[in-house]
């Protein structure tokens, strides 16, 4: 009986440790600021912050970028310091895609490579 109690105690301690590590990892992942990109419908593209406002300036650092591609005729591509024409969604893709990006100081452009006039810019300080 005593050995079963010891095994149970070890299992409970191990489970608590796993839960703690899982919570810490989840907290780290959710700590990144979020950006929301949208391409389509039609010839529209946008990038908004967590408050829903158009991004014109950001602080350098890591961000979670969630792109909602609403048209299979476009792609969402990001270009700037340290990010060379990173295609986040392709023309055959419709739906959400989440990536982590590290933004350095400078000027960035987000655009559709198929329709380059579907384009906007922002600065990172």
Can you describe what each PLM-predicted range is?
Residues 61-65:
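Structural beta-strand segments of beta-rich domains
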Residues 9-17:
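Bacterial N-terminal signal peptides
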Residues 66, 75-79:
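Beta-strand signatures of extracellular beta-sandwich domains
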Residues 25-50, 73-74, 90-125:
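Extracellular/periplasmic metallocenter environments
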Residues 1-9:
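Bacterial N-terminal signal peptides that target proteins for export
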Residues 51-57:
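Short beta-strand segments of immunoglobulin-like
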Residues 16-24:
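C-terminal segment of classical bacterial N-terminal signal peptides
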């Amino acid at each position: 009986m005593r050995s079963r109690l010891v095994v149970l105690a070890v299992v409970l301690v191990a489970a608590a440790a796993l839960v703690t590590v899982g919570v810490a990892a989840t907290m780290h992942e959710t700590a990144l600021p979020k950006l929301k990109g949208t391409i389509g419908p039609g010839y529209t593209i946008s990038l908004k912050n967590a408050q829903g406002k158009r991004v014109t300036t950001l602080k350098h650092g890591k961000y979670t970028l969630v792109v909602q591609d609403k048209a299979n005729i476009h792609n969402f591509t990001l270009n700037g310091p340290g990010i060379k024409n990173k295609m986040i969604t392709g023309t055959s893709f419709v739906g959400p895609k989440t990536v982590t990006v590290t933004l350095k100081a400078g000027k960035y452009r987000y655009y559709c490579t198929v329709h380059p006039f579907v384009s906007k810019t922002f600065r990172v300080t």
